[in-house]
Amino acid sequence: MTATSLQMNLFLKLLLSSACVAFIAQRWSAPTFRKEDLKGARVLVTGASTGIGEQLAYHYARLGAQLVITARRGNVLEKVVSKCQELGAQRALYVSADMANPSDADLVVKQAIDELGGLDYLVLNHIGPSPYAMWNGDVNFLSYLQMAQKALPTLEESKGSIIVISSLLGKMCGPFALPYAATKFALNGFFGGLQHELAMQKSNVSITICVLGLIDTDNAMEKIKDYINMTAYPAHESAWHIIEAGATRQPESFYPWYTYYATLFRDWFPYYRDKAIQYSYTYNPEMDPKPVTTN
């Protein structure tokens, strides 16, 4: 074995050791999650008719929270609310709204505050229904900002939290999801900056940015089935991870496990990073790729 090979092996061992130490330190330093703290918590979940948002609603219901859920389809939300009530939610209500309409975003927050008497958690999870809506940015980005601004006063009073559902595609560039990724990068930038501002102002409000990989929602599975070589992780597990991270007021959380390491080492080996990303896709020039989403 050459001296160069020995040096490379030593470097890789040190790199792996550093990654393990960083991961253990992150997990060790996280506060203990207590389920009982969420009993009676006042929670607004957006994008809650299907996928991760639906699973978030069910988990919060099992924990005895008071829920307002929102999405576009009222008939689907009605069924989700009914199940939340069966699972043990103290209260469960829905507001049918289209986040492409600025007045709807304000209305949802106002109605949730009026119905619940305030908010402890604002969980921002919705996405636009089409690539055109994503390019526009009204749904995937601007409505998040608008709802956060509207909810901040009541969250300040309750020492509450904003939970933002983001994506690994908002940390690392990837193909065939450009509108979606662009808005996730924007969310990470805005809410990451807002975290600093709130900390400097000694605010009572915490922000948790949840970085997700590929999740097995119906929406995501339908759009990626022909051209992605990746394992999708369960929506119900990702939802539980999100709730735990928000309840313990972590500034950032990662699910599944590989998203943490991908983010940690994204700039260390750019050539291999790019090859790994491209290898994850089955590209056929004759295909018309559909935007990848995870929510």
Model segments located where?
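Conserved glycine-rich cofactor-binding loop
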Residues: R42, G47-T50
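Conserved glycine-rich Rossmann-like NAD(P)H-binding loop of the short-chain dehydrogenase/reductase
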Residues: L63-V80
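Rossmann-fold cofactor-recognition segment
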Residues: Q85-S103
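Conserved mid-core segment of classical short-chain dehydrogenase/reductases
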Residues: D106, K110, D114, I127-D138, ...
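Active-site helix of classical SDR
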Residues: A148, T183
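Residue(s) in the substrate-gating loop at a strand-loop-helix junction
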Residues: S167
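SDR active-site lid
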Residues: H196-T259
